[in-house]
From Swiss-Prot:
Protein name as annotated: Nucleoside diphosphate kinase
Catalytic reactions of this protein: a 2'-deoxyribonucleoside 5'-diphosphate + ATP = a 2'-deoxyribonucleoside 5'-triphosphate + ADP; a ribonucleoside 5'-diphosphate + ATP = a ribonucleoside 5'-triphosphate + ADP
Subcellular localization, as worded in the UniProt entry: Cytoplasm
Main location: cytoplasm
Binding site for ATP: 9, 57, 85, 91, 102, 112
InterPro entries from the UniProt entry: NDK-like_dom (IPR034907), NDK-like_dom_sf (IPR036850), Nucleoside_diP_kinase (IPR001564)
A Pfam match: NDK
Any Gene Ontology biological process: GTP biosynthetic process
One CC-aspect GO term: cytoplasm
Subunit note: Homotetramer.
Species assigned in the record: Thermus thermophilus (strain ATCC BAA-163 / DSM 7039 / HB27)
Length: 137
């Protein structure tokens, strides 16, 4: 069964959006295979966003993602990677359609509420970064 990594970012946790976001995924029929509330360390943030290391926004991205607790999860279901991306909406809130998570809740490109794996390969890498095998149910 296909799995993807999803993270509700500090702005989503701070604004009390965790329950609503989880409910949307459950209503779609996705199974939660793992879930935890956590603070991301500087090292984990840098590893997670390694592809952006040379970009000018990298320090701000790491600073933001380590600024408060996040909810990390693994969702499972047919076509889950692509479907979660669709449910999240465009990265920039101004481009995100109403009815998508970012369209409904994101305020800026920096505080866009949620992260989801872009590909199956990214999902496998990100799941391994955030969860030990025994944490996956």
């Amino acid at each position: 069964m296909e799995r993807t990594f999803v993270m509700i970012k500090p702005d989503g946790v701070r604004r009390g959006l965790v329950g609503e976001i989880l409910a949307r995924f459950e209503r779609k029929g996705f199974r939660i295979a793992a879930l935890k509330l956590m603070r991301i360390s500087q090292e984990l943030a840098e590893r997670h966003y390694a592809e952006h290391r040379e970009k000018p926004f990298f320090p701000g991205l790491v600073r933001f993602i380590t600024s408060g607790p996040v909810v990390a999860m693994v969702l499972e279901g047919p076509g889950v990677v692509a479907e979660v991306r669709k449910m999240m909406g465009a990265t920039h809130p101004k481009d995100a359609l109403p009815g998508t998570i970012r369209g409904d809740f994101a305020t800026t490109i920096d505080e866009n509420v949620i992260h989801g794996s872009a590909t199956l390969e990214d999902a496998q890498r990100e799941i391994a970064l955030f969860f030990r095998p025994e944490e996956l149910l």
